[in-house]
Amino acid sequence: MDKNFIIDQNMINYIFSHTNNLHKVQKKLLKYNEKLGHIKKLQISILQANFIQFIIKINNYKSYLEIGTFTGYSILSAALALPKNCKLIGIDKNL
């Protein structure tokens, strides 16, 4: 998580225990992003992705909007946590 966000190991363990293991597509995307050099810093961390999933699940959200998707790792993580028949929107600049 961000350096300014205080989170202890107990919270990290709790988040990981209430979220999914990495999906094979997430693993493939992380591997792809590793090859992008310094620009890979735009990707969120695995912990941040799990935190997004955790927030979606505990609040039973039915929709998710993401502005700035990079290669799609974070929105994919959100999609995996959302229930069926939900609304998922990703917006990014067309380069």
Feature-to-residue mapping (PLM):
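A short alpha-helical cap/connector motif
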Residues: M1-L95
